[in-house]
């Protein structure tokens, strides 16, 4: 079942409430969340409470109680935090703001198994990495690991303010009831028309197929930049959501990019984040690479 919101932050707020309501209905007494270090889930109160960056949380403390942070891609770290009060584990299959870190297959499978064994809900935040960006409609599909709750936004409206969180039927049966949650403009006709149109275009133009065709070329060109410039130490990511670790000051890189007419953004640490349109072609990637060569020289 799907509940429409106005943004990704709102989608994550709804997901957290849905998880708490699930535990409440079952009478388990569970309320704690385990989130990941370097994660980003939004700036509203609940979403920022599960965001793994001190810089986002500290100015607004005390925040929502019962949140613990585990090391991303470290299953033992997660296991050490699980107890009888754990309600849900929330993670991004591919961390964007946190520095373009991709979850391993072992980690995703381990989280799913841990949740199944302890009646804990698995929440995947795909606000940024979903909608075809990693080569499947949603990133979790690339792992074959289905979450209990999925959040999405950004690309589902192609610029129109809209987000959503989806629950499995089992979770929905125990979760939000009429009056538990609401959004004045959630599911409004304009936003939902945009979503319907976007999904139609995805299917008609095989957008996910295009991502899979173009992504290897994108990766190849980023690897060329890494090989060519000593200041580029690592390439990270998957599909059309990738990053380069740079030793030069990122502000300097960003300023030069603006001069070149190239829109890039910094991720956690010295990482340049590349999140091109899903309809990008080789010629656009070539133009980007030439601009980056001038910027990094």
Would you name each region that the model predicts?
Residues 1-297:
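Conserved N-terminal phosphate-binding loop of PLP-dependent enzymes in the Aspartate aminotransferase
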